């Protein structure tokens, strides 16, 4: 029997969402994504501790920020040895509201990859989908530096990223699901509120439809999954980035997977363009309590994990 994972690959490019690159080979993903939390999780494992220790040792006397950048590139280059496609490396979340410093950091990361023999076409720079992050992506894209816009929870963020010419967006599914499930509390009914009705699934479907309807070339990569149902409900999305745990579940399943998203259906939808000047962007984002709260929370969590990683490095110096 064909596995659910192999069926999914017929409709969607499968991406591995992990810093634990030793798990990549068995799932044969096209691309891979990382973030500060995943790198922090990886370097706490015995298998990856030597990479951290070597990076600190090789750059003794340099700043902690300098060492972290080299650590991200060390993980990225190892990941690229195991996949045919691209790796996403994230700009420090503490720069989420600083356009110029985000631009500078994106350029620096690409230079480090190129110095390691990796072409920029194999790297995506991850930026938070704040107004400032989107403006940074607009500049970097014009320079041939491709960007992956993360912490994306709303259509207005997606529309702004597309207008800025971002290579790819990562609309989150699981974190939207978490928010609505918490809001409903005891009234949440998984059978009724999950599956095709899952608010996170519906958000990505809405964004995908908007992009294909208006002919945007920005790729849509669903992210942040809690269940395999959320994944299979988005079969047909351009890409889906999936944790090793859920990749394993899909690999072990022979449940039928049908295409759920289609560019042809999206083109026939009746939609209006979203206004995306700065004031409209900020108002629409502010008007969406879920997106506002999850964006702020995501930046806080990634920033906190960056601080934890800095402390680990300090302890080794």
From Swiss-Prot:
Keywords: Cytoplasm, Pentose shunt, Schiff base, Transferase
EC number, UniProt record: 2.2.1.2
Chief location: cytoplasm
Catalytic activity annotation: D-sedoheptulose 7-phosphate + D-glyceraldehyde 3-phosphate = D-erythrose 4-phosphate + beta-D-fructose 6-phosphate
Catalytic residues (positions): 126 (schiff-base intermediate with substrate)
Subcellular localization, as worded in the UniProt entry: Cytoplasm
GO MF annotation: an example: transaldolase activity
Gene Ontology BP annotations: carbohydrate metabolic process; pentose-phosphate shunt, non-oxidative branch
Pathway: Carbohydrate degradation; pentose phosphate pathway; D-glyceraldehyde 3-phosphate and beta-D-fructose 6-phosphate from D-ribose 5-phosphate and D-xylulose 5-phosphate (non-oxidative stage): step 2/3
Main enzyme class: transferase
GO CC annotations on file: cytoplasm
Cited function: Transaldolase is important for the balance of metabolites in the pentose-phosphate pathway.
Complex formation: Homodimer.
Protein family per UniProt: Belongs to the transaldolase family. Type 1 subfamily.
Protein name as catalogued: Transaldolase
Annotated organism of origin: Burkholderia pseudomallei (strain K96243)
Lineage: Bacteria, Pseudomonadati, Pseudomonadota, Betaproteobacteria, Burkholderiales
């Amino acid at each position: 029997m064909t596995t659910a994972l192999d069926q999914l690959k017929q409709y969607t490019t499968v991406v591995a969402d992990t810093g634990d690159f030793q798990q990549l080979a068995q799932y044969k993903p096209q691309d891979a994504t990382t973030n500060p939390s995943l790198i922090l999780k990886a370097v706490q494992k015995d298998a990856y501790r030597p990479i951290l220790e070597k990076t600190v040792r090789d750059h003794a006397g340099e700043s902690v920020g300098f060492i972290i950048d080299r650590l991200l590139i060390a993980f990225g280059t190892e990941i690229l040895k195991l996949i045919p496609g691209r790796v996403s490396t994230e700009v420090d979340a503490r720069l989420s509201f600083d356009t110029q410093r985000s631009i500078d950091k994106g350029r620096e990361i690409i230079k480090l990859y190129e110095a390691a023999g990796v072409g920029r076409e194999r790297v995506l720079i991850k930026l938070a989908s704040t107004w400032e992050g989107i403006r940074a992506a607009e500049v970097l894209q014009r320079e041939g530096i491709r960007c992956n816009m993360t912490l994306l929870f709303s259509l207005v963020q997606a529309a702004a990223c597309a207008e800025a010419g971002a290579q790819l967006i990562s609309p989150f599914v699981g974190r939207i699901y978490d928010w609505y499930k918490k809001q409903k509390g005891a009234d949440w009914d998984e059978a009724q509120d999950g599956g095709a009705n899952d608010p996170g699934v519906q958000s990505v479907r809405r964004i995908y439809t908007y992009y294909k309807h208006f002919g945007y070339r920005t790729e849509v990569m669903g992210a942040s999954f809690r269940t395999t149902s959320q994944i299979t409900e988005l079969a047909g999305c351009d890409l889906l980035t999936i944790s090793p745990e859920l990749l394993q579940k899909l690999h072990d399943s022979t449940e039928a997977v049908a295409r759920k998203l289609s560019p042809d259906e999206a083109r026939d939808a009746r939609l209006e363009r979203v206004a995306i000047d700065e004031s409209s962007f900020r108002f629409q984002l502010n008007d969406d309590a879920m997106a506002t709260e999850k964006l702020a929370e995501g930046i806080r969590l990634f920033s906190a994990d960056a601080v934890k990683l800095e402390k680990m490095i300090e302890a080794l110096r």
